[in-house]
Amino acid sequence: MVNEYKAHSSFILKVVITLIGYWIASILAIIIYSMFFKIETNTFLLCLLLPTPIIWFNILIGMGLTYRCMENLTIYDKHKLWCVFVRDLTLTILATILATLTTMELYQIEHPLKPIEFVFIVGLVLIVGFTIITTLIIKYLKIIKNLKKISKN
């Protein structure tokens, strides 16, 4: 038998992960594009700010629906769903960072920056990405620890 609330929560969380991944990818793409191809500041800010409220509004609606569905689940099922959410979010962000680095390499071939600038930008992307991924992995491990405690009880 399928738990209807668990299925709804799982699906909505996957949609939220997709929206977060799209938002991060679009922000990184705009920033990287503006570094290699000089664009006006107004255009840059418009590209950054235009999709953000729309995407985050949808993310908030999705999280609200998830919270509503999760009210009917057991504590174990809630932790299990959050565990899957954090795991999938980590993989999505990792894939986005790797795709960004690949894009930067291709842009560097076509429209080269100074080597020191390029190395600095790549280092910055790696440091920020490593920090976010590490934070998510720590959160994942905490959720796993809580799952073990709950399953023992």
UniProtKB/Swiss-Prot annotation:
Gene Ontology CC, one term: plasma membrane
Keywords: Cell membrane, Membrane, Transmembrane, Transmembrane helix
Protein localization: Cell membrane
InterPro entries: DUF5418
Alphabetical list of Pfam families matching this protein: DUF5418 (PF17439)
Protein's UniProt keywords contain Iron: no
Top-level taxon of the source organism: Archaea
Protein name per Swiss-Prot or TrEMBL: Uncharacterized protein MJ0587
Native organism: Methanocaldococcus jannaschii (strain ATCC 43067 / DSM 2661 / JAL-1 / JCM 10045 / NBRC 100440)
